[in-house]
């Protein structure tokens, strides 16, 4: 159970990080 929570939290963190990074790149590109 503990590993499932850690894996879920890590996956969520990576999704948020990737989304924010792509959003910044998309904003800087002027689109």
Swiss-Prot record:
Tagged with keyword Ribosomal protein: no
UniProt topology in membrane: Single-pass membrane protein
Transmembrane segments: 5-25
Keywords: Chloroplast, Electron transport, Membrane, Photosynthesis, Plastid, Thylakoid, Transmembrane, Transmembrane helix, Transport
Cellular localization per UniProt: Plastid, Chloroplast thylakoid membrane
Alphabetized GO MF terms: electron transporter, transferring electrons within cytochrome b6/f complex of photosystem II activity
This protein's GO CC annotations: chloroplast thylakoid membrane; cytochrome b6f complex
Primary location class: plastid
GO biological process terms held by the UniProt record: cytochrome complex assembly; photosynthesis
InterPro entries: Cytochr_b6-f_cplx_su8_sf, Cytochrome_b6-f_cplx_su8
Tagged with keyword Phosphoprotein: no
Chain's role: Component of the cytochrome b6-f complex, which mediates electron transfer between photosystem II (PSII) and photosystem I (PSI), cyclic electron flow around PSI, and state transitions.
Family named by the database record: Belongs to the PetN family.
HAMAP family, sorted: Cytb6_f_PetN
Quaternary structure note: The 4 large subunits of the cytochrome b6-f complex are cytochrome b6, subunit IV (17 kDa polypeptide, PetD), cytochrome f and the Rieske protein, while the 4 small subunits are PetG, PetL, PetM and PetN. The complex functions as a dimer.
Protein's recorded name: Cytochrome b6-f complex subunit 8
Encoding gene, per UniProt annotation: petN
